Amino acid sequence: IYNYMNEFLDSIIRRDPAAKSHLSVLLTYPGVKAVFLHKLSNKIWRMKLYLLARIISQIARFLTGIEIHPAAIIGKNLFIDHGMGVVIGETSEIGDNVTLYHAVTLGGVSPSIDSDSQRLSKRHPTLKNNVVVGSGAQILGPIIVEENAKVGANAVVLKNVPKDAVMIGIPAKNINEKDKIKDEKFRPYGVKINND
């Protein structure tokens, strides 16, 4: 567990210039608490102790403002930065080294009527490794966001996203087709890197 925690905290320090130390990240970053509590609630969920798992996830929501369903599958080093309002639905799957900014929703699109027929189906998105999702973005339905894709702030993604795509707008469109911006760094907040 010590190695896991060190790798996790190091990954946050690499991605967040405001992160100063392992201790400060551990004590003051709500996304870290939410991920740790999700690991616990997910383990309990897999033991089929569903109510206890939901109680732990609700405690995490109360403490952090981040809602992660205990059944969601999350890989290594998920960084939820400024996490207030993040929602990760029940059948969501998240790969390794994914970054989510505040108010991101990984949600379903199925209507709440006839929920019995939807109960065992995939309803939420899958984010592959190294995906970055900007603040306020909504990724909805059982779609796949492939590796290294970037989703801009407030984008609404309703269709599968190819590898290395840069998605912006409502509905989101890929602006990285045909390597139009291959040398430019993605800016989830729209701020230029190095004041260029």
Question: Each PLM stretch: what is its role?
Answer:
Residues 1-64, 179-196:
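Terminal amphipathic alpha-helical/low-complexity segments used for targeting or macromolecular assembly
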Residues 24, 28, 62, 86, ...:
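Conserved short-loop catalytic and cofactor-binding motifs
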Residues 31, 36-39, 72, 78, ...:
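Solvent-exposed, flexible loop/coil residues
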Residues 31, 47, 69, 89, ...:
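Residues at secondary-structure transition points
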Residues 52, 56, 99, 105, ...:
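Extended, non-globular alpha-helical segments
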Residues 58-68, 112-117:
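Short gly/ser/thr-rich secondary-structure transition/capping motifs
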Residues 64, 69-70, 75-76, 81-90, ...:
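Left-handed beta-helix
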Residues 117-140, 144, 170-196:
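C-terminal segments of enzyme domains that contribute to small-molecule binding surfaces
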